[in-house]
Amino acid sequence: WEDTNGNTITKALVGDEVYLCADVTDIDDGATATIKIVEKDDEGEDDDIESVSGKVQDGKIKAKWKVKYTEDNDDTESQKEMEEKGYTLPEYAFTVECEGVESEESGQLDVKDEIVLTVKNFDELKGKTLKLVWKDGSSKEIPIDSEKLKISDIFIGSAYMLIK
């Protein structure tokens, strides 16, 4: 898994564009391979999510994928996570298949429950507080102390913002 800058990653946000990358051997450049993405399950019953294709170039395959939210409700910890957060976070992996041969599974990509907000009018808002409020009434307050606000452990879903 790589980000758009080519850095290896193990975590991403829903909506991030990531690259699925793998070294390949004994496959000619230009050959098309299928990359199968799964949502990992503790019990080994992984859920098929999507397949994308890419061409082998210089002994590597690379394909772009947009991280999506898939409910992970069949792990042993799913119920606990649902009770604590109100949702579950998926973990993804992929395999590459070409000419009838399937690769080993990739490392895992964990979906993070955070957002990064850019404060365009920071000079006006510095020192104030941003309050996020979700449909169920839960909320989180964040001090506006930077032009980039990284907010972790948030709920998935729409929220409205108040500045006070």
Where are these regions (language model features)?
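Short, compositionally biased P/S/T/A/G/V-rich stretches that sit at domain boundaries
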Residues: 1-14
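Structural beta-strand segments of beta-rich domains
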Residues: 16-20, 113-117
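Structural motif
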Residues: 24-27, 115-129
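Short amphipathic beta-strand segments in non-cytosolic proteins
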Residues: 37-49, 131-141
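Short, acidic Ser/Thr/Gly-rich low-complexity loop/linker segments typical of extracellular
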Residues: 52-56, 138-150
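Short, hydrophobic beta-strand segments
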Residues: 56, 61-88, 151-155
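Short beta-strand elements
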Residues: 99-115
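Short Pro-Gly-centered beta-turn/loop motif in secreted/extracellular proteins
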Residues: 148-164
